[in-house]
């Protein structure tokens, strides 16, 4: 089915975990000749990222979780107002379908679409369903999940379960291409570790890695690190490396522009367990040590990591467990026997769905074909 002249609305915002999977789908829809418009919130991450690629419209929207009593009282009124404005926007755009990728902005747009009989697809990136998507699941035409979710039958009605599909997380094509490339773990004397602090950085991870390199060197483990610190921690982290030989450092940077190159370079990654990072590591076949963000809502990062850990493709340490001793207890055996890394890589590639974007596109075509 052709999507030519179909007006499809993408709504996602707040964090990269919502925005980047949505961008992957938006690009695929455009390649299929759909007219794509993004709806986000002003003064947010999507406002600085999306305009380079797509037309974006803005509505004001905010969450209620962990807010004061006044904001909780006024939230229903604001939601009703934003939903009404969203209805006007969708009519103006002549929307044929809305795809919500989470973030508070998805709420009013998807609710408005359901009210005026526009089909809605929602996509949940995490292994715990977020508050917005839990509400929207009642109104969605199709519910797409990235992971198998524990006790889903207790959260969804039989009607909701019937319209639920596990599709994985959309990731960039250059990362998907790594899935077909065999990782060769030789008996090289150097163990290449990619450290990802996330876009905002991860202070605890940034602080311990320089100490890990020093301790590893003392024990005869030769680590070379490519360390993405996040903008706020760059100078502080660089300072922590000042006494470490450059032979152990590939790069220390606030951001990595080309993640496919970084994933391809590494033998092992140490990172948080955001949905997109977990999906990219698995699809790229990169063994990981996940350190879930302790403050993540509903502990969703821990559950994201379990999809990989339970398939023997990675490890998970709570932040309070992230000691030099525990990290070395994982790294030392992997360094001594590289075949373990190779086996983990093979298992990682089998863990998650790599054609997620195409599966979501198929959902779009089926819905529009039946309208």
UniProtKB/Swiss-Prot annotation:
Keyword Protease in annotation: no
Pathway of action: Cell wall biogenesis; peptidoglycan biosynthesis
Chief site of localization: membrane
GO process terms (BP): carbohydrate metabolic process; cell division; cell wall organization; lipid glycosylation; peptidoglycan biosynthetic process; regulation of cell shape
Subcellular location: Cell inner membrane
Name of a matching Pfam family: Glyco_tran_28_C
Keywords noted in UniProt: Cell cycle, Cell division, Cell inner membrane, Cell membrane, Cell shape, Cell wall biogenesis/degradation, Glycosyltransferase, Membrane, Peptidoglycan synthesis, Transferase
Top enzyme class: transferase
Reactions listed under catalytic activity: di-trans,octa-cis-undecaprenyl diphospho-N-acetyl-alpha-D-muramoyl-L-alanyl-D-glutamyl-meso-2,6-diaminopimeloyl-D-alanyl-D-alanine + UDP-N-acetyl-alpha-D-glucosamine = di-trans,octa-cis-undecaprenyl diphospho-[N-acetyl-alpha-D-glucosaminyl-(1->4)]-N-acetyl-alpha-D-muramoyl-L-alanyl-D-glutamyl-meso-2,6-diaminopimeloyl-D-alanyl-D-alanine + UDP + H(+)
EC number(s) from the headed UniProt entry: 2.4.1.227
One MF annotation (Gene Ontology) recorded for this entry: undecaprenyldiphospho-muramoylpentapeptide beta-N-acetylglucosaminyltransferase activity
Top-level taxonomic group: Bacteria
Tagged with keyword Zinc-finger: no
InterPro entries assigned: GlcNAc_MurG, Glyco_trans_28_C, GlycoTrans_28_N
Any one annotated GO CC term: plasma membrane
Membrane-protein topology: Peripheral membrane protein
UniProt: UDP-N-acetyl-alpha-D-glucosamine binding residues: 15-17, 126, 172, 199, 256, 275-280, 301
Family per record: Belongs to the glycosyltransferase 28 family. MurG subfamily.
Protein purpose: Cell wall formation. Catalyzes the transfer of a GlcNAc subunit on undecaprenyl-pyrophosphoryl-MurNAc-pentapeptide (lipid intermediate I) to form undecaprenyl-pyrophosphoryl-MurNAc-(pentapeptide)GlcNAc (lipid intermediate II).
Protein name (Swiss-Prot/TrEMBL): UDP-N-acetylglucosamine--N-acetylmuramyl-(pentapeptide) pyrophosphoryl-undecaprenol N-acetylglucosamine transferase
Gene name of the encoded protein: murG
């Amino acid at each position: 089915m052709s999507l030519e002249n179909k007006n499809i609305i993408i709504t996602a915002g707040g964090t990269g975990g919502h925005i980047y999977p949505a961008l992957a789908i938006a690009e695929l829809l455009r390649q299929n000749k759909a007219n794509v418009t993004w709806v986000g919130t002003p003064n947010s991450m999507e406002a600085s990222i999306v305009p380079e690629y797509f037309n974006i419209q803005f509505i004001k929207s905010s969450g209620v979780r962990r807010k004061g009593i006044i904001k909780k009282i006024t939230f229903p009124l604001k939601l009703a107002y934003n939903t009404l404005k969203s209805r006007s926007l969708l009519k103006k755009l002549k929307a044929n379908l809305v795809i919500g990728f989470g973030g508070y902005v998805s709420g009013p747009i998807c609710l408005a679409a359901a009210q005026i009989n526009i089909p809605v697809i929602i996509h949940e990136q995490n292994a715990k369903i977020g508050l917005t998507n839990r509400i929207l699941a009642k109104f969605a035409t199709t519910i797409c999940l990235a992971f198998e979710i524990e006790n889903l039958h207790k959260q969804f009605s039989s009607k909701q379960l019937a319209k639920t599909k596990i599709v994985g997380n959309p990731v960039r094509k250059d990362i998907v291409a790594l899935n077909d490339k065999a990782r060769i773990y030789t008996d090289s004397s150097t163990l290449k570790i990619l450290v990802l602090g996330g876009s905002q950085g991860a202070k605890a991870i940034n602080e311990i890695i320089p100490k890990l390199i020093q301790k590893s060197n003392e024990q005869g483990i030769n680590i070379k690190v490519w360390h993405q610190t996040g903008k706020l921690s760059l100078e502080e982290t660089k300072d922590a490396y000042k006494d470490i030989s450059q032979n152990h450092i590939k790069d220390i940077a606030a951001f990595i522009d080309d993640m496919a190159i970084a994933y391809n370079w590494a033998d092992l990654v140490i990172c948080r367990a955001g949905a997109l990072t977990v999906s990219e590591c698995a699809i790229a076949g990169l063994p990981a040590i996940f350190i879930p963000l302790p403050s993540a809502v509903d502990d969703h990062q821990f559950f994201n990591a379990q999809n990989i850990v339970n398939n023997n493709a990675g490890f998970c340490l709570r932040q309070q467990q992230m000691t030099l001793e525990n990290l070395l207890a994982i790294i030392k055996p992997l360094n001594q026997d590289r075949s373990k890394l190779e086996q983990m890589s093979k298992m990682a590639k089998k863990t998650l769905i790599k054609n997620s974007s195409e599966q979501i596109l198929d959902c779009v075509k089926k819905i529009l074909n039946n309208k």
